[in-house]
């Protein structure tokens, strides 16, 4: 099964780059990506057109008329060409088995929902400035949770 990963974003290219790097590390690699931008920023357009990743990316935008995330998500859902959708926010770095696990539990007429782990400011900044630290993230999280 091939999913489409829809990423809802608003101007934060640093976080989107971290998401893309986490997508490059996925154990399941056959997926499409739609970046659903609630707005139309030059920085986002330049970032997406100036970088290449190992998966196809479709960038959808709309006018920045205040918070209108749901409208751009509806456009992204309509633009998808696959049978399974995974929708995430533009500040969620993914575990390397994120797509694999979604597909393992995917079934017709089923909706999967999950929660994210909200990181403190220090850990968030570390992930955004040194992406290699994500490899050690599970161990760091356990240390803080136990």
What residue spans do the PLM features occupy?
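Glycine-rich, basic loop-to-helix element that forms the pyrophosphate-binding segment
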Residues: 63-80, 97
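A conserved acidic beta->alpha catalytic loop
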Residues: 37-46, 53, 92
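Cell-envelope/extracellular polymer assembly enzymes that use nucleotide-activated donors
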Residues: 2-4, 32
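Short, acidic, metal-binding catalytic loop of nucleotide-sugar glycosyltransferases
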Residues: 21-30
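Short aromatic/hydrophobic "clamp" motif used to bind/position activated sugar donors
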Residues: 85
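Short beta-strand/loop segment that forms part of the nucleotide-sugar
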Residues: 30-40, 58-62
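Conserved short acidic donor-positioning loop in nucleotide-sugar-dependent glycosyltransferases
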Residues: 11, 23, 37-40, 64, ...
